[in-house]
Amino acid sequence: MKLNFMLMSGVLLFGMYSCTPGAQDYSSYVNPFIGTGGHGHTYPGAVVPNGMIQPSPDTRIYQWDACSGYYYADSTINGFSHTHLSGTGCGDYGDVLLMPTVGKQDYHAMGEESQQMAYASAFSHDNEVAQPGYYSVFLDRYQVKAELTATKRA
C-alpha cells in the first residue's frame, strides 16, 4: 500500500511538472532605438545585462545631443566605441573607438565644430539592425557590413 502511494505520488508530481509552461523569450519585443532621438541619450548598441562592454556606433562628437554617442537623426558613423552609459545626459562614451575601413585613410579631424571625423561613413537606417546583444549596419563609404555582439560576463 505504501509503495503504491509513493509510485502514484511520483507519477502525479512528474505529470504536474511536465505541464508547466516553458520560459518565454521576450527579447523580440525590445526596440533598442527608443530614446536615441530627442534628448533620451540612449544608444542602440549590442548590450546584455551585466555585460562588460557596450559596443555601439558613435555618430556625434560634440554638444548636448552627443551624450550617448548616437543620435538617430544623424546619417554618418564616426566609429564604434566599446563603453557607453545609457540615458545619463553627460558625455560618457568614445573609449576604444574602432572603425572598419578599406583603402588609404585620412585621419585628420574635419574641424572643431564638425560632428564627423575624416574617416566617417554614411549609413542608412534601412540597413541598420539592433536587437538585445546584437547590432549591425552597412557602411556606405566602405561597402562594409559592421556587426557588433555582446555576451554576459562569466
What are these regions, as identified by a protein language model?
Residues 1-24:
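Bacterial Sec-dependent N-terminal signal peptides
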Residues 22-154:
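Accessory carbohydrate-recognition regions in carbohydrate-active enzymes
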